[in-house]
């Protein structure tokens, strides 16, 4: 016996059989040991051959058990194993059988045949008793081999290659495992047309990710099963190749190629009956490529060109261009079929077709309006993905969220149960008390507990009943789907009696039961059982941060009072606050142009009048966070080449992979305020980039991604024309100098840029009477800083007036006041705190002196109400 003539699998089995013999205490290595490890193998090649040859695997195992128990056992021996005469004959016969069949290696099936043929071996008797004959085994082996010989040490891994490395889509379609494919008739027809050609009959489905390329292949499988295809494709098998399984575990050089050749050989042997579907077709290029080895695409080319291999590929536009088009010889063997993104209307039809599958899976109902909302909202707000995939995901997640709520305890019941627990704890504490008041309280608690427990039991029963009702509806849907699948199979197989029973008996009965179950509307139901547009909108809001869900009463009031809220932070600029508020209200009411940003404004005015502060106040109002905005200081973009910092460097330049400051921020958070500060400082070319943003609400970054700006508020600030605004009188209207200011603005910016901005807002200089309110705002901020030390500031009216007068400078706005407060309030306070004059928890009264402020600390008078953080008010 030459062990090198045996395949790796057989060598492994011989080794396992030796280990088994030693562990059993047998000194002789017999055929029974070999058959035992062959039959118990996980992959089950031997067991499968026995079954296919008409044998009973259970009987083989029982016979083996009996034979192995009769073998002589030795304990305390020297672990020496001797080859028995029958096993030597079995090995010799296996080598002879392999040689006659033209095999270079002895394989598992040849060894099994030898075990059945060798009369001196007990295994022949066992297999014969279980109904296995050598003739039947040879017939099954020839069917499995399909004329191939064992030319390598890993020959067994190539048997039934299609079963191992491909999935039968037509079989899945027959079993009803595939989702229905709605629409896409044109693409499926075009695919069938290419498949019906004589040569190069290989379509490749090319389209963006998520448009339904794989669904078209599944649609083709469904059509083949239903017989809705031309004669040339009738009864064909559509097999989806699993590239991962092909490559996985191919350790040795040439093993991957061997597996792929085995797959191709099976497809070719089927004489055109098998169509191979290769999803992510670009993975063929370079798959299995090592030094000197051929990759998968080169192995496929000859068969593709001759028309021996029917193949349907699917890949994205980008990957087709990147991998397949570079290999012209591979590209010419495929005929492209372009798959476009479906329209919103088509997506709604697709969702309606899939609705039942999702209802059955999540055990909730999905309203038709939720499907319409999913298609429309995903199309509008999720711009970096494609229909129908993103709409299907929305419905799936909305149904999943609702199912979680159904499985959780209802809020009403949860509150009662918590109250019961609280009262039980109180009752136990009162039981040890002996006074009359405690006894009285105990009686009241007992009564309340009994009422609450009764209510809890009632609500729990109601909740369980509602859950059960939902489960029943889902169960009926599943039975209905199974019945419809059975009807389709019966019609295909010509079993008309069974089809009649299903079509006119079982299915109508199930439909009636389902309609009855769904029509029982529960008044005052504890559970929400239907996915509505609101649920879909909530999911969109979670994904993108864009508030598309229905406004709650509180938010409506807040939006209507927006001017007052922002006015608490921005003083004296009523027109600007009003313009911003109107834009936000338009957007939240759904009345803004869907293809433009929520609002785009240029704020013009002298320094320190609140241009940047208004932007911060808006961000704080919308997101409860001052920092929820992208602030871009345009003084950093003075050179022409700095444009690439906004949108990302083009290919070939350093920093290409990093993306742009502006585009990356908006891609990550599509709903936010964007502030371009001091816009006149930027290079004129920067404004060219903004033209598309202001007009169409989109911008293409350096990597070719389209970034959506339709949910942003764009604010640009500038000091242009400030000299006219500064010289205005206290009570003069800003409109009187608008023409002068606009003249300066037009000289700096191009008409096409100014024409795209929604509104140019002029900020007038601050009036003297505005200063008091600004002092209050600044002092509030200082108070917030001191809140950790529990120090309360009490600013008297005279001190307030003193600060307002000293900090007022019409040319510089509110910034001088900030400096005055720093010098006259913060500096003295800091010194007094460090000296220990002002202790933690003190109240400090601030009054005005002749040339400075006076601070009078009153110890231990800290105000219990912690000061409200100023930016939380907005």
From Swiss-Prot:
Chain intervals for the UniProt region annotation (Repeat 2): 83-147
Keywords on record: ATP-binding, Chaperone, Coiled coil, Cytoplasm, Nucleotide-binding, Repeat, Stress response
Coiled-coil ranges (or none): 392-524
Short name of one Pfam family: AAA
Segments for region (NBD2): 555-765
Gene Ontology cellular component annotations, sorted alphabetically: cytoplasm
Full protein name: Chaperone protein ClpB
Native organism: Brucella melitensis biotype 1 (strain ATCC 23456 / CCUG 17765 / NCTC 10094 / 16M)
Lineage: Bacteria, Pseudomonadati, Pseudomonadota, Alphaproteobacteria, Hyphomicrobiales
